[in-house]
């Protein structure tokens, strides 16, 4: 398929630049994959779509304050965006204004430039930085000097609401530079109501990297190579999925990152033995892919021509997805990270859809 097949015109007025103050009050579009029927609700109504005995799986990654600033030895300012924490003292990061930065270069951070970092390696467009601090770890340093990086399309200044509302209420494991945005709509009362209904809830971890915002630069989408991200799916989650399906329950993934984590685990040798899956994944899911685990997906409305809308098309069907997005635009749903949500069920015929546009 061509990249242009996933293009659509989105009025700027439908891009949400601010979060919902009450998470679960955002709008919810429900679409059933096998019929294409659409219903308009509020997110707290999602409890009506999920049954006792179903299993919801969420991504418990926590966004780190991954953006901070420093000075080169020459005095020039740089902006650092952490891609991954590599160890106690090492990070992998992109650096703006990186001219003349090479292996061995020194960068100074923090109050009065007291924190020294050295560039010890260059990997593609990323730099590995070693912090010389003998007291604080890399994550401690980042927590002290960094700020939460909002998506690049949000140009306004960050505020106190962002610090809280650009994290999920169930965050646990630090490592993402972007929030798993489908999970932002869940608040504690909704999670409690689902639990009281008999819905099982469990977690995976996929640390979202900067690649989630990178555009596809190929005309034919099959030529695109996905960025790599760290993922953990525990043996207990794998066992719980198998047990749920055996009893006739459904697996509901919250977010494309959760779905990608589960499919990555399924395709590994760990799945059949129900062993912990801890690895990196660059799985690219696009139309034609046969889904193996997830029965329903909760997700936001995504960018045109993004890998995320391609995943949705693979799950819901191309024609269903484009119809849903057109309907969302007509009905003035909010788009992107702080926008509204979809609850979609798997269309088992999607892999066999006629892709002649």
Curated annotation (Swiss-Prot):
Q: Gene Ontology terms, cellular component aspect?
A: cytoplasm
**Keyword Transmembrane among UniProt keywords:** no
Q: Which EC class, in a word?
A: transferase
Annotated GO biological processes are: queuosine biosynthetic process; tRNA wobble guanine modification
**Annotated compartments:** Cytoplasm
Q: Which InterPro entries match?
A: QueA, QueA_dom1, QueA_dom2, QueA_sf
Could you name the domain of life of the organism this protein comes from?
A: Bacteria
Q: Which PANTHER family does the record cross-reference, listed alphabetically?
A: S-ADENOSYLMETHIONINE:TRNA RIBOSYLTRANSFERASE-ISOMERASE (PTHR30307:SF0)
Please identify the protein, giving its name as recorded: S-adenosylmethionine:tRNA ribosyltransferase-isomerase
Highest classification ranks of the organism = Bacteria, Pseudomonadati, Pseudomonadota, Gammaproteobacteria, Enterobacterales
Q: Which gene encodes it?
A: queA
């Amino acid at each position: 398929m061509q990249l242009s097949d996933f293009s659509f015109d989105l009025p700027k007025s439908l891009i949400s630049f601010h979060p919902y103050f009450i998470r679960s009050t955002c709008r919810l579009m429900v679409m059933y994959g096998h019929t294409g029927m659409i219903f308009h609700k509020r997110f707290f109504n999602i409890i009506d779509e999920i049954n006792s005995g179903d299993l919801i799986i969420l991504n418990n990654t926590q966004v780190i304050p991954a953006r901070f600033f420093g000075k080169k030895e020459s005095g020039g300012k740089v902006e650092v965006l952490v891609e991954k924490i590599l160890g106690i003292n090492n990070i992998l990061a992109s650096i703006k204004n990186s001219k003349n930065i090479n292996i061995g270069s020194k960068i100074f951070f923090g109050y009065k430039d007291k924190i020294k970092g050295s560039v010890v390696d260059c990997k593609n467009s990323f730099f590995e930085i070693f912090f010389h601090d003998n007291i604080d770890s890399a994550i401690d340093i980042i927590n002290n000097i960094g700020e939460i990086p909002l998506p690049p399309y949000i140009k306004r200044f960050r505020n106190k609401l962002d610090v809280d509302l650009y994290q999920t209420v169930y965050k646990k494991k630090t490592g993402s530079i972007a929030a798993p945005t489908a999970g932002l709509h869940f608040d504690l009362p909704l999670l409690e109501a689902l639990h009281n209904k008999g819905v099982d809830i469990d977690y995976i971890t996929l640390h979202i990297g900067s690649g989630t915002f990178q555009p596809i630069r190929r005309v034919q989408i099959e030529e695109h190579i996905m960025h790599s991200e760290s993922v953990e799916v525990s043996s207990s989650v794998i066992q719980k999925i198998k047990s749920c399906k055996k009893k006739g329950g459904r697996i509901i993934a919250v977010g494309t990152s959760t779905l990608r984590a589960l499919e990555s685990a399924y395709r590994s040798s760990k799945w059949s033995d129900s062993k912990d899956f801890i690895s990196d994944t660059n799985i690219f899911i696009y139309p034609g892919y046969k889904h193996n685990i997830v029965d329903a997906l909760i997700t936001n409305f995504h960018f045109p021509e993004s890998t995320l809308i391609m995943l949705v098309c693979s799950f819901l069907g191309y024609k269903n997805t484009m119809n849903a997005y057109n309907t969302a635009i007509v009905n003035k749903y909010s788009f992107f990270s702080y926008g509204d949500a979809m609850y979609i069920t798997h269309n088992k015929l999607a892999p066999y859809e006629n892709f002649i546009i």
